[in-house]
């Protein structure tokens, strides 16, 4: 099985412009993500996908593989364009978030391994939520899944809704999980989901994976114990343990 790792990267972000090129202890964010991804032995190849010349040149300078794409609304669409245009073809594409400079290669391996099951079309990771602050944070996407570990729903709001219990009992009555924003797709499925129309639920929650669920695509969810730290605003860099 040939697995392609793609790191979609755009320069402009509403909360952190130029994020991929921000310096983190002497290396750009995109370089740190790329180097972590390269440590995953299950990836046959790793590319950065961008529509920005500055990011392209930066990746070339540190010796990484990079391809220019057209503008896209999502990293998923950017991954699809790159995967379809490469001469070499891959069975699975892993969409690696470009704002997680400390991503653990074991998380990528954990996700890639799920595709040894031929029934896995799309896959992602989740980690149990332990605090009320994290549960109530709208930047933390929550996921619920069935007994076979297929996603039932994603939301920026707590699911299931814990408000019928006092706050101190929330974690007694339910397990809550946050979505780790790394995806794997079979290459043919990636192409299919990028041709789907946006749905109203997707627009409301600003979560593209709801479009896939509403179109009956199954998303396998694997629980991980490994923490994930995304950089949403500049002050998040101070929290990194480098």
Report each predicted region and the residues it spans:
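N-terminal glycine-rich phosphate-binding loop and ensuing alpha1 helix
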Residues: 2-49
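Hydrophobic/aromatic residues located in beta-strands of well-ordered beta-sheets
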Residues: 5, 46-48, 93, 123, ...
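Short, high-confidence coil segments that cap the C-terminus of an alpha-helix
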Residues: 43, 88-90, 118-120, 217
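Short phosphate-binding loop-to-helix
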Residues: 47, 53-110
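Conserved alpha/beta core of the MobA/IspD/sugar-nucleotide pyrophosphorylase nucleotidyltransferase superfamily
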Residues: 88, 170-242
């Amino acid at each position: 099985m040939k697995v392609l790792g793609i790191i979609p990267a755009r320069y402009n972000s509403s909360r952190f412009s130029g994020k991929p090129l921000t310096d983190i202890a002497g290396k750009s964010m995109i370089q740190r993500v790329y180097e972590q991804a390269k440590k995953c032995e299950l990836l046959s190849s790793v590319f950065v996908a961008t529509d920005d010349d500055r990011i392209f040149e930066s990746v070339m300078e540190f010796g990484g593989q990079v391809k220019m794409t057209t503008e896209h609304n999502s990293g998923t669409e950017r991954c699809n364009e790159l995967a379809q245009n490469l001469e070499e073809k891959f069975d699975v594409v892993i969409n690696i978030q470009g704002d997680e400079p400390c991503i653990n290669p074991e998380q990528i391996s954990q996700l890639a391994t799920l595709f040894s099951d031929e029934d896995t079309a799309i896959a992602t990771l989740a980690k149990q939520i332990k605090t009320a602050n994290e549960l109530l944070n709208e930047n933390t996407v929550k996921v619920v899944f069935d007994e076979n570990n297929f996603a039932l729903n994603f939301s920026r709001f707590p699911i299931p809704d814990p408000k019928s219990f006092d706050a101190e009992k929330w974690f007694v009555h339910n397990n809550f999980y946050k979505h780790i924003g790394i995806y794997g797709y079979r290459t043919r499925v990636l192409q299919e989901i990028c041709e789907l129309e946006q749905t109203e639920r997707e627009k409301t929650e600003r979560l593209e994976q709801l479009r896939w669920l509403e179109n009956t695509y199954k998303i396998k969810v694997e629980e991980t114990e490994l923490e994930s730290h995304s950089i949403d605003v500049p002050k998040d860099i101070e929290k990194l343990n480098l």
